[in-house]
């Protein structure tokens, strides 16, 4: 009983912390500005510009002091009196500041959790760096995989209710509810639903979405690990989560009453593995398709009865790993059969044994990557390199270093690919795009520019990756031939977005 209570225990030691007054502190908006700087592989670092200037922030805080937005009515004249002509700008600044404030609260929860629990309990707090080694080790022993698209249309009240479990400051929750309902049209869309793919206020909406996913995964992992004991567990230990046990019991009971009258341990699968990144998750298992279908309908009931979200069974696809390729984190991953020949000789008899083994293979999806290059004006939609407009005051070395940086980041991120042919094509596009950009700057032809610069210019794009990786792995990667044979996962978590978001 105590074990279950600790699994979903909420940190109540800081429940009297008040987050609402932080909205009146200028340094909060400075933090939002600093965190908002875009670290992108295919584009320059872009900040908020003048949107978060100290004058605008001070003016906003002054108006918030003069008239509390929590007591606003739905009258447009009162809203316009507060925001004036900068309604869109002020709403964006407040949303970014609110995201920073609530993230501070979640960071305190994490620190408190790590202080009270031993480090071994935090094995579920894994970064994306552990995903590919996990797939490499585990997927070769699994048989079936479910590619799940997590519902991203969430009602506003569900978001506020989810945050209520973690944030005990009523003023902040009232502000959040008011802010979402009153300024939803300004923020994203007339519909009262949040979507993961919103372009404006990404920090604010990604926080709301991730908090909702965190709640979903906590319930999912609890029911997954403790399902065999749910029937004998008292509902009193879940008092902190409103109607939690009733909803879980109903979701599981509906599923089992429609199929078998059996005990819940039949539902427990020790070989079930779960991986998620953003709006996509993968559940893989070694067992039969029957159990995978049971998990499928269980997830549907979980979303419908616990989160009140319409979730169609068609959003969960069950496939055999040997016949299916996963598009995940900028890679196209699959299981391929790799044959190995073993020769054994005893006296004069020579035996040759050919073994076929499953091997995790990851390839670079060239079409989506060319689409990203096209959006960044390095190539057209067909993959033909084009010149990129640059500032007239930029030097040749700055332009070359920028292209080299992009090539290096792409090579590092896709260093775990088993086939480098697509990566070579991308580097070829960037190399010629750099040549065309420099020729355009000097107003000369490409052939003339190459004659002036010599062959050493193109060699920089080929040697850059070898030099950097040889510093990282000096012993393993001794020759260039071996460099491209081995798989090494060198992910940059700060520059990942362009490679995994092809929308």
From Swiss-Prot:
Which keywords does the record carry?
Chloroplast, mRNA processing, Plastid, RNA-binding, tRNA processing
Write out the GO biological process terms: mRNA processing; RNA splicing; tRNA processing
Q: Where mainly found?
A: plastid
Q: Which GO terms describe its molecular function?
A: RNA binding
Cellular component annotations (GO), alphabetically ordered: chloroplast
InterPro entries, per database record: Domain_X (IPR024937), Maturase_MatK (IPR002866), Maturase_MatK_N (IPR024942)
Subcellular location per the Swiss-Prot or TrEMBL entry: Plastid, Chloroplast
Biological role? Usually encoded in the trnK tRNA gene intron. Probably assists in splicing its own and other chloroplast group II introns.
* Similarity comment: family membership: Belongs to the intron maturase 2 family. MatK subfamily.
Q: What is this protein called?
A: Maturase K
| Originating species | Backhousia myrtifolia
Gene name, Swiss-Prot/TrEMBL: matK
């Amino acid at each position: 009983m105590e074990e279950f209570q600790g699994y979903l225990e909420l940190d109540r030691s800081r429940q009297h912390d008040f987050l609402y007054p932080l909205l009146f502190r200028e340094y909060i908006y400075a933090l939002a500005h600093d965190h908002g700087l875009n670290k992108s592989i295919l584009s320059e670092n872009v900040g908020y510009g003048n949107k978060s200037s100290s004058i605008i922030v001070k003016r906003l805080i002054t108006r918030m002091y003069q008239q509390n937005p929590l007591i606003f009515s739905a009258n447009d004249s009162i809203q316009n009196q507060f925001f004036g002509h900068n309604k869109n700008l002020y709403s964006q600044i407040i949303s970014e500041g609110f995201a920073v404030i609530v993230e501070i609260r979640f960071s305190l929860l994490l620190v408190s959790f790590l202080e009270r629990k031993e480090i071994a309990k935090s094995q579920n707090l894994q970064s994306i760096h552990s995903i590919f080694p996990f797939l490499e080790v585990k997927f070769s022993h699994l048989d079936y995989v479910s590619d799940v698209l997590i519902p991203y249309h969430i009602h506003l009240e569900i978001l506020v209710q989810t945050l209520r479990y973690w944030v005990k400051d009523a003023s902040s929750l009232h502000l959040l509810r008011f802010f979402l309902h009153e300024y939803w049209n300004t923020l994203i869309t007339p519909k009262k639903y949040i979507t993961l793919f919103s372009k404006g206020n990404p920090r604010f909406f990604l926080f709301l979405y991730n908090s909702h996913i965190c709640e979903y995964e906590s319930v999912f992992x609890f029911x997954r690990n403790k399902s065999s004991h749910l029937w004998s567990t008292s509902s009193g230990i879940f008092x902190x989560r409103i109607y939690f046990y009733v909803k879980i019991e109903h979701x599981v009971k509906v599923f089992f009453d429609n199929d078998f009258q059996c005990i819940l341990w039949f539902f427990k699968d020790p070989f079930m593995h779960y991986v998620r990144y953003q709006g996509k998750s993968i559940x893989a298992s070694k067992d039969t398709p029957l159990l995978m279908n049971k998990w499928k309908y269980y997830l549907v009931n979980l979303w419908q009865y616990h989160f009140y979200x319409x979730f169609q069974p068609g959003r969960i696809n069950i496939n055999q790993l040997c016949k299916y390729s996963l598009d995940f984190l900028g890679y196209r991953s699959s299981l391929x059969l790799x044959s190995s020949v073993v020769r054994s000789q005893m006296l004069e008899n020579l035996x040759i044994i050919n073994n076929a083994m499953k091997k995790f293979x990851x390839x670079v999806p060239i079409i989506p990557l060319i689409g990203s290059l096209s959006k960044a004006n390095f190539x057209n939609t067909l993959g033909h390199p084009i010149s990129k407009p640059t500032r007239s005051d930029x030097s040749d070395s700055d332009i070359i270093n920028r292209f080299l940086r992009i090539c290096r980041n792409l090579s590092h991120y896709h260093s775990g690919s088993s086939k480098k042919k697509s990566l070579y094509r991308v580097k070829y596009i960037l190399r010629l795009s750099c040549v065309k950009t420099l020729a355009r700057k000097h107003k000369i032809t490409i052939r003339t520019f190459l004659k002036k610069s010599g062959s050493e210019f193109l060699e920089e794009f080929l040697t850059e990756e070898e030099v950097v990786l040889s510093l990282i792995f000096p012993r393993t990667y001794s020759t260039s031939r071996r460099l491209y044979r081995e798989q090494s996962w060198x992910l940059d978590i700060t520059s990942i977005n362009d490679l995994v978001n092809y929308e």
